[in-house]
Amino acid sequence: MTTFVDRVELHVAAGSGGHGCASVHREKFKPLGGPDGGNGGRGGDVILVVDQSVTTLLDYHHKPHRSATNGKPGEGGNRSGKDGQDLILPVPDGTVIQDKAGNVLADLVGHGTSYVAAQGGRGGLGNAALASARRKAPGFALLGEPGDFQDIVLELKTVADVALVGYPSAGKSSLISVLSAAKPKIADYPFTTLVPNLGVVTAGSTVYTIADVPGLIPGASQGKGLGLEFLRHVERCSVLVHVLDTATLESDRDPVSDLDIIEEELTQYGGGLNNRPRMVVLNKIDVPDGKDLAEMVRPELEARGYRVFEVSAVAHMGLKELSFALAELVGAARAAKPKEEATRIVIRPKAVDDAGFTVVLEEDGLYRVRGEKPERWVRQTDFNNDEAVGYLADRLNRLGVETELMKAGARAGDGVAIGPEDNAVVFDWEPTVMAGAEMLGRRGEDHRLDEPRPAAQRRRDKQAERDDAEKEYDDFEPF
C-alpha cells in the first residue's frame, strides 16, 4: 500500500455566501415597522497551511475533492447569518502549489505558511442594509455570491540541507541510517528505496537534515527509473553528496563512470543544481576489493576538485569525519544565504469596487458587458423578484452601462449579455425603462409609509371633535 505521495491534483471549492433576508418588522400596534432583514454569512475559505507533522500528500490522493461550508442566510429581526467555517488543509513543508497549466501559485516553506486556494463568497445584503432615505422599504434582498472553485496541483519538494544521490544499491539508505536516527528500508537489491527518507544529523553544535533520494540511473532526467519522479526533492538541498559504490559486481561500472553519469543527469534536469557544493563518498570500503578500488580512484576525484571521504556504513568507518565535513558545508551554505528580513505585512483588499467595464459587440449581434461591478451585481440579483431586477437596472444605469450601450449602437430589443460566455445573463435591452415604476415609483419606496395611517387619522379626527365641543361649551352663554 502506498504510504508516500508527493504529487496530487486537488479540487477545492470555497463556500458560497448566504442570501440576504427580506422581511418587515412586526410588532403589535406597528403594522409597518420597517425592513429588518439581516445579511447573509460569508462562505468559508479553503486554506493550505504548512504543518511540520505532515510528511506526505497521501490524504489528498485518496480524497481529492475538498470544500468549505456555506454561509447561513440572514433572518428577520436584523439577524445576520453565520459565516461558513474555513477549511484548513495541512500540507508538508516544501509544498509547491501550481495550476493545471503548470504556473506556480505559491511555494509553502516554513511552519505555518499558508495560501488561500479558494475564497468564500460574500453574503448578500438584507433589505435592512439596502434601505435608505429614498428607498425606505425594499421588498427584496441580495443573493450570496458563489465561492471560488479551483483545480490545483500539489507537488512536494523535500526541504533538507544535504541530499544523497547515486546509483541504486550504492548504500545511501544504509548511510543515512547510521548518520541519523532514520530507519529506511534496507535490502540487497536495486530500488529498495522508493520514497525519499529524511534524517536529522547532529555534528557538534550544528544540526542539519539529510535526505536519501531514490537511486538514479542513466536517462533519469528523461523519465527512466524512479529518478525523474524524485529529482525535484534535490532542488532545495544546499549540499549534494555523491555516494559511490566501490564494491559493485557489475563489470561495466566503476565509481568514476557512476559519478559522470549522475552528474550528467543532474545537469540535464536543471533546477540550478550545477552550482551546489558537492562531496564524494566512497562507500563499502569494508569489502577488501572496495578498499583497493577507493584508493585507486581517489586521486582522480580529488584532481577534479572534489572532497573525497572513504566510509563504510556497515562497519561505521569514517562517519564522524564525514558528518563534521557536511556540517561545515551546511554552515557555509547557510551563511551565504541572504539574511531574511521580517516580512512587512501589507493588507491590500481585493478590488471588488472597480467601476471599470467594457461593452463589446460580438459577431452574432450580441452586446457583451464585462466588468467587476456589473458581473457581481448580476450574481447578487434574484431574477424571480421584479423589484430586485429593477434595482439592478437602476444600478447599471447609474454606472453608465446604458450610456455605453447606446454609444456602441445598441437599440431597444437588442440582446445584451453580462458576464463571461460560460456564465452570463442574457436579456433584451429596453433603455430608460424603470421596471415596476408604475407601482412603487422610486425603487423600493413604499408610499404607505408616507400616507397617514387610518387609525391615527381617526384619533386625530375624534380629538378635533372633542376640542370643538369643548370650545363650544366654553363659549356657551346661558339665557
Curated annotation (Swiss-Prot):
Give one GO molecular function term: GTPase activity
Check the record and name the CDD domains matching this protein.
Obg (cd01898)
Would the keyword Repeat be found if you checked this record's keyword annotation? no
One GO biological process term? ribosome biogenesis
Q: Pfam families from the entry?
A: DUF1967, GTP1_OBG, MMR_HSR1
**Which GO CC terms are listed, alphabetically?**
cytoplasm
Oligomeric form and interacting partners: Monomer.
> What name is this protein filed under?
GTPase Obg
- Encoding gene (name): obg
